[in-house]
Amino acid sequence: RKIDDANAGVYRKSQVFISGSKYPLPGPDKVPQMMKGVVQKIADIREKEHPVAAAAKAHLEFVFVHPFVDGNGRVARLIMNLVLIQSGYNIALISPVRRAEYISSIEAAHKDDEEFIKLICSSVIETQKDYLRMLNI
């Protein structure tokens, strides 16, 4: 899906919903302030958590606000991978085979983020194994 130029990089101005989710997203009027909080929370998480757990939690912090009309998951994964790279880890690629698990673990993370963190941990490991296989190591 391609986002139109008027909405690219701009906080959403309308209410959005995630189909299948029982957790409502914040209203558009709350997004700017919540995003300031997300930036601070990510900084705090990075100081306290293991880098892989911090990356997973940074992803969740962003995606729970869902600040854009489109591309929130992609941006959340970019943030997650930035945290990983800055901490000396390789990126975590979520296999298309695990997409349903990825979505359900995000939904479950509203109450307990352990399943999502485990998914990201295993994705970091699997991505590293894929790199090694490609290099015949």
Q: What positions do the PLM features span?
A:
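FIC/Doc superfamily catalytic core
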Residues: 1-70, 74-137
